[in-house]
Amino acid sequence: MSIWFWYALMAVGLGGMVWCAKNQRRVANAQLYSVICLVVVAISAVMALTSFFGDGELEQSIENAKQFELAKVDQIADFVNKNHAGQKVVVLIKSDMLNPSEHQIDTLKEFSSRVQGQVTLLEPVVLQITDPSTLQPEDPESGEMPYIPSPEEELNAKKFNDKFKECKAAGADVVVNFAGMPAMPEDTQKLIIWRWGTKDPKVVLAEIMEMNFDPKSLLGPVSAFVASKPDAQFDYLKDTAPENFKEAFDLRYVIVTKENAPNVLDENGMIKSGLK
């Protein structure tokens, strides 16, 4: 079918989700319809990608994405081994990352295997998020589904702060955060880790997508954070990511630390262009 058909079907699905969200308290089974619309959107997105790129290009894009993610995990593990050897490390990870699909890497497994023997790895702390595919109707007869929280509701400052406190209570010297950041930028500024002192764990952030604060001010409680290079040139559909993890990482990312911050951050606290 034409790619425009899948775009149209995706638009219908999105429109249905919006309608269900606005009418979930007035319309019976609105949440069930919302889940159905979500499935329609997901299927349409996959079919649109397949129609647009073709099987070969889509597969190439997926493999490149996996290689860059592996490279990121590899270099974070290398940083932890060199800078926090012998310390107690806990990984903060989202629940949906514990059972990765064939198109995703097993972040926890890959990181753990790379730091084994270099640090004391504590039990991971899991940030639970809702998986719509596991939900069952609250009322089997009507088929009414339970309320599905939005990303803003699930990935908020309170939920992250509770998990950071859990990491600290576990006795960790270092928290490696692969769970990302709150969905809302203003929530990111409310995280307790920015106020942690010398007696609190150090934090390694796997990636900061949008920095609505001065990164230089973070490099007290934060041992390091990974950021994308603003001028990285790479065509996911046509290029092939380097097999060497460091080369792949350096192509797209930079690890920012207190030591290299003056060289990689500009006067506004943003990542400089032209980094090698």
What residue spans do the PLM features occupy?
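A residue-level marker of the well-folded mature domains of exported/periplasmic proteins
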Residues: M1-Q31, V39, I43-K276
